[in-house]
Curated annotation (Swiss-Prot):
Expressed abundantly in embryos and the lung, and at much lower levels in brain and heart. Pfam families: FGF. Its main location: secreted. Residues 1-36 form the signal peptide. Belongs to the heparin-binding growth factors family. GO terms for biological process: actin cytoskeleton organization; angiogenesis; animal organ formation; animal organ morphogenesis; blood vessel morphogenesis; blood vessel remodeling; branch elongation involved in salivary gland morphogenesis; branching involved in salivary gland morphogenesis. Interacts with FGFR1 and FGFR2. Interacts with FGFBP1. It is found in: Secreted. It comes from Mus musculus. This is Fibroblast growth factor 10. Glycans are attached at residues 50, 197. One of its GO terms (molecular function) is heparin binding.
């Protein structure tokens, strides 16, 4: 390559003295690596840009999928269950609308239909008494013949695997009020309940048919 440069320099500038040709040659030689280096950097930069855009386009669908994925929790779902409390009672709604707990696992009033009415919001209805589980603004549990706002309960799965059911419409001093049965199977007032209270924890048990 250097032979070619010397030959062409000599033919292109025959009128220049030898020393000038030498200086010209040195100039060309010194500038050539810089040009190659700049060209190499441009190529590397271009490859990096292409790789970056390629990587971005490749990872985009998966990352988008994580955000787009739907978590419509049991919306429109209907389940038949018995709600077994952490205090060892089955929640019942009797034929007169009274809410209580029983140790009898075969009690017909403990058979409940749990229906999702909104995302994370359910209605609980006793099949044999035809009453809905309801909580009024004072935190009292009662059975309602008609579905109303008192019957909307927020269902949440807790860390221990049990569920909690809080009034969707009513709070007490900014705090949630929960469905709960005390150690004697009696319903607790919503004002005295907290999400961490085990008396408000229920295990939905599948009904064997």
């Amino acid at each position: 390559m250097w032979k070619w440069i010397l030959t062409h320099c000599a033919s292109a500038f025959p009128h220049l003295p030898g020393c000038c040709c030498c200086f010209l040659l040195l100039f060309l030689v010194s500038s050539f690596p810089v040009t190659c280096q700049a060209l190499g950097q441009d190529m590397v930069s271009q490859e990096a840009t292409n790789c970056s855009s390629s990587s971005s386009s490749f990872s985009s669908p998966s990352s988008a999928g994580r955000h787009v994925r739907s978590y419509n929790h049991l919306q429109g779902d209907v389940r038949w269950r018995r709600l077994f409390s952490f205090t060892k009672y089955f929640l019942t709604i009797e034929k007169n609308g009274k809410v209580s707990g029983t140790k009898n696992e075969d009690c017909p009033y403990s058979v409940l239909e749990i229906t999702s009415v909104e995302i994370g919001v359910v209605a609980v209805k006793a099949i044999n008494s035809n009453y809905y589980l309801a909580m009024n603004k004072k935190g009292k549990l009662y059975g309602s013949k008609e579905f109303n706002n008192d019957c909307k309960l927020k269902e949440r799965i807790e860390e221990n695997g049990y569920n909690t059911y809080a009034s969707f419409n009513w709070q007490h001093n900014g705090r949630q009020m929960y469905v709960a049965l005390n150690g004697k199977g009696a319903p607790r007032r919503g004002q005295k309940t907290r999400r961490k209270n085990t008396s408000a924890h229920f295990l939905p048990m599948t009904i064997q048919t």
